[in-house]
Structure formats: structure tokens, C-alpha cells
A protein has these predicted regions:
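Catalytic tyrosine of NAD(P)H-dependent dehydrogenase/reductases that use a Tyr as the general acid/base
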Residues: 14, 173, 216
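Sec/Tat signal peptide C-region and signal peptidase I cleavage site
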Residues: 32-37
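Hydrophobic alpha-helical bundle signature of multipass membrane enzymes
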Residues: 39-213, 244
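Bacterial N-terminal signal peptides
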Residues: 21-31
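Interfacial helix-loop-helix junctions of multi-pass membrane proteins
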Residues: 205-236
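Short alpha-helical linear motifs
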Residues: 153-159, 184-185, 221-229, 249-252
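C-terminal membrane module of polytopic membrane proteins
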Residues: 232-257
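N-terminal secretory signal peptides that target proteins for export/translocation
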Residues: 1-17
């Protein structure tokens, strides 16, 4: 799978202040080292305790702390703009948006059935189910360590008026839903290139729903998309991933006959 600047721009493009996006995601990559890098307990992105949980990734690769810029600083103009966008999106969300977002609290690759087709269910595709479970668990591990590294409070923590439903205790940046859904989508879209646009669109929707219920800032969502590309790129270096990918491709082809 090839990743280029054009592809990244397509994934990141949503109606959001471009100046904020440039300041948060582009300039810090050149000018600002990762936060907390001097903290030895946090500088190992995937610890020995996490190694046994990895399926297609090697320890420390990819590291969110090395790929992503820091999130906006507390009390900064960037943070204020990010929070304003959360409030705007949250208050504009419909009841259907809210229901969809809460319905995706737990999700798997089979949430993409609407984009793929009626045959795309776990009971029909055991190899596909097992493969994507590993893919998602690896993505979750990388993302969770990124959250613990950057320590960004969630929007509803900073502004309690945004609190609704059962609230997560984890940190905000990068978004796990955005990262995991885009990882699933990028891999699935390579398996089913004819469904590429619909698959990617659904992943973007899963991520954006998290802003609509004030679980994440827009910059959390964009960071997840960047991290997802890095994770999938690293997957492609794994022989185990490539072997399982080929087996899943054959299973999907057979299921469509």
C-alpha cells in the first residue's frame, strides 16, 4: 500500500479552520519535539508488558509520540478554537447523529457491512473476523499508548457542560475511534478496492461522530487518521500480516461468488 501527501490530505480534509490545522499538525512536526520525551517511563511507546498483545507490529513501531505533533496547549488560542468547534458540532448534532455515535462505542470491521455488502458478516467470514480482530487490537495498543503519552483531557473534562452519557476515563489525543476505524478501513479498502470510497467515508463518519458527542476534539480525529496510515504502513512490513491478508482476500472473493 502506498501513502503520499495527496492521500493524507484527502483523509484529513474536513470543514475545519485550515490555519488551526496547519499550526497544530504541520508546523510542530518541524519545530517542536514530542512532549514528555525526557520522561523515561513514557518514552518507550510500546512497553515489554504490551509486547505479548501485538500481532503484526514490532515493539515501539509505530510510536504516536514520534509521529504526531503535540495537541494544542491548554489555554492557547489553538485550544480555544478546537473547543469552539466541539461546542458548535455538539450543539448542531441531531438525535440520529447522537444515536449513531453511541451505537458505535464498540465496533468492529463488520460495522462496514453497509459499505461492503450483505454477505459481510462474521459468521460467514471466520478468517476475516480473526484477521481484523488482530488488526484492531494492534491499532488500539498503539493509540492507547499515545493517549497516555500526550495526556490531553477530553472536551467534557475541560467543559463539564458537554458531559453526556457514560463518560470515558481515558485521555483524548489521538482518538481511538478515529485511529482504529481508519486502520480497518485502509486495510479493508485494499482488499476491496471497488468499495474504497464508501469504506473510507464510513471510517471518517465513525471518527467525526466522536466530536458530535463531545468525546473528542477535531484535532484528535485528524491525529487518528495520520496515525492510522503509519500503523498500516508498518503492518505491510510483517510477513504474518501479508500471509493473513492473502488468506482473507481469498475468503472474501469466495464469499462474493
Amino acid at each position: 500500500m502506498k501513502f503520499n501527501r495527496t492521500a493524507i490530505a484527502r483523509l484529513l480534509s474536513l470543514s475545519f479552520n485550515r490555519s488551526l490545522w496547519l499550526a497544530v499538525f504541520v508546523l510542530p512536526l518541524v519545530a517542536i519535539p514530542p512532549l514528555r520525551a525526557a520522561d523515561d517511563t513514557m518514552s518507550q511507546p510500546i512497553s515489554a508488558a504490551k509486547d505479548s498483545q501485538l500481532h503484526y507490529l514490532k515493539s515501539g513501531k509505530p510510536a504516536a509520540s514520534e509521529i504526531l505533533p503535540p495537541p494544542p496547549l491548554p489555554n492557547s488560542a489553538e485550544q480555544s478554537a478546537d473547543m469552539d468547534e466541539v461546542r458548535t458540532v455538539y450543539h448542531a448534532a441531531s438525535s440520529n447523529d447522537m444515536a449513531a455515535a453511541f451505537g458505535e462505542k464498540k465496533f468492529s470491521v463488520f460495522n462496514f457491512a453497509g459499505a461492503v455488502g450483505g454477505y459481510f458478516v462474521a459468521t460467514n467470514l471466520p478468517k476475516t473476523a480473526a484477521f481484523f480482530e488482530k488488526v484492531q487490537l494492534d491499532a488500539e495498543t498503539v493509540t492507547d499508548l499515545g493517549k497516555d503519552y500526550f495526556h490531553r483531557p477530553r472536551p467534557f473534562t475541560t467543559d463539564p457542560s458537554l458531559a453526556n452519557g457514560k463518560l470515558e476515563k481515558s485521555f483524548s489525543y489521538p482518538s481511538g475511534h478515529s485511529t482504529e476505524s481508519m486502520v480497518l478501513a485502509l486495510v479493508l479498502a485494499e482488499l476491496l478496492p471497488e468499495k474504497h470510497d464508501a469504506i473510507i467515508a464510513h471510517a471518517r463518519q465513525i471518527g467525526w461522530h466522536r466530536v458530535q458527542i463531545a468525546r473528542h476534539y477535531p484535532t484528535d480525529i485528524y491525529a487518528g487518521r495520520v496515525l492510522a496510515q503509519a500503523i498500516v504502513k508498518q503492518f505491510k512490513k510483517s510477513d504474518a500480516f501479508e500471509n493473513d491478508f492473502d488468506a482473507v482476500k481469498a475468503e472474501l472473493a469466495a464469499a462474493q461468488k
